[in-house]
Amino acid sequence: LDPKIQEIAESVYEDRGSLNNLTSASGQLIHSGITIIEPSTGNIVAMVGDMGPKSGNLLWNYATDIQQPGSSIKPLTAYAPALDAGAVSPATTFDNYPVRLLNGNPWPKNSPNTYTGWTSVRNGVKASINTIAVQTLEKVGVTAAYQFATENLGLSLAPEDMNVSPLGLGGLTYGLSTVEMAAAYAAFANSGVYNEPKTYVKVLANDNSTVVLEKETEQRVAMKETTAYLMTDMLRRAVNESGGTGGGARFSGMHIAGKTGTTNDNYDRYFTGYTPYYCAAVWVGYKNNERISYSVNPAASLWRQVMEKVHADLPDKSFNRPSSGLTTVSVCADSGMLATDACRADSRGDRTVSYEVAVGTEPTTECTLHKMVDICTEGNCLAGEFCPAESIVQKGYLDYVREDYGESITASDDAYLISTLEKAVAPTETSPGGCPVHTSAAVTDPDDPNGGLDPSDPNWQPPDPNDPDVPIDPDTPTEDPSGGDSGGGDQPTEPDPNDPSGGFGDAGGDWWSGFWGDNTGT
């Protein structure tokens, strides 16, 4: 133990005001345990077994007692194993939506019970999303994840825990101690090297020189250096970024990474986090299970109060970063694949994002989730057969169909699915379907779609309404139908004796000659 750090931890834990004298609805006092480890050595530098003034020796030690870790186990049993095996990268995406039905109910549920749709592993860690953790675990496999957690990170999981729910969500058969959790997380801070936790280095005889007992550091490479770094990067975001669950542990002037944990009905609250100097795990709960009601995660709050004082005189420094083995990729935020024009034309805006990933896990194929579709800007829907060209734009939407679990189970990106657009314009009992604005086509003459207009002829004139085949010449006055006679109408005129046919030539023959001969008296 480090006497200075031990004294700091005890001072915070002896004062129940550190959690505002928190009690349960039935009046139970809150309990907590904390273990602080130096990642580079595995030395336990401080441990406190309960809150409140110490009333005796050999009291119950909540730091070494096993408790349910909740979601704080996910980095150890789902994300780190999958990253280390190359099964996923921080850029890999899964659908944040119930994975399947379990006993007739959509499973798993998130906390809160909302779903966002396609989400990256990085954001799944940051926001502690159950559906992403489960799918990540299933990607690497339950057996591989269990072996990674027990053999590489020293977790005392029961054989019954070799299942999706315990490893993916944290509902363990028995539980884990803060010592185990702190030692396992310390491997992230120690570039992937796990040190067995120890409470002493050596024991001296009364002469203060003779070594009676010595404890050697037992260590092993638990994961790749790149895995440890990428896990740290994601856990750092969980503490420092908006939407992260670990904001209650944050204090200024130090790099911090960590993960919260909560069990059903808020019976257990956990936080395990680390800096470049120390790693600490905190459990909070009641002796008899009761709901913990507190404005923030009380475990994260205690962690911050202790660790801020521990680091008060230490300079800030960055976490260890591998000298090689990492690369930055530009991908589609929804598919995690190489972005296409359709990704950049998404109706929400350009979906291209950058991720740091391990070399060899970067995507090599283009996004297959986004497709370009025609959208009517006036109807705000899929363009139909009657939508004019000037109202149509092309946008990128997600070509994906979700399982229907009822109206109460939705995802926030449902509006950006092609299947949702198609459903909106499908015929119903009360609607013919299609674009609500453009419901029929304009009527045009198929032989003259311009309606008589010749845009290429600047001298074109509209047709004469009395003779549509003859256009009106504006330079030629229209003839008076009355022939200019003030009496109006057609008046009889004497025919031309030299052309009795009136311009018809021999039309009429002898009939015309006889007619005019008889009437002229000749």
Predicted regions located by residue number:
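Secondary-structure transition/capping motifs at alpha-helix termini
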Residues: P39, K54-S55, L83-T92, S156-A158, ...
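Mid-domain, small-residue-enriched loop/turn segments at the edges of structured enzyme/sensor domains
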Residues: P106-N110, G141-A183
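Soluble, non-transmembrane domains of envelope/secretory-pathway proteins that act on or interact
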Residues: I256-A257, G261-T522
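Short loop/turn motifs at secondary-structure junctions and domain boundaries
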Residues: L22-L29
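Envelope-exposed proteins and targeting segments
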Residues: I30-G33, P90, S165, E196-T199, ...
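Active-site SXXK
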Residues: A9, G42, Q67-N96, G124, ...
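A penicillin-recognizing enzyme superfamily signal
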Residues: P3-L22, I36, M47, P53-D65, ...
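Conserved catalytic neighborhood of penicillin-recognizing serine enzymes
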Residues: A87-A145, V164, Y194, N206-R237
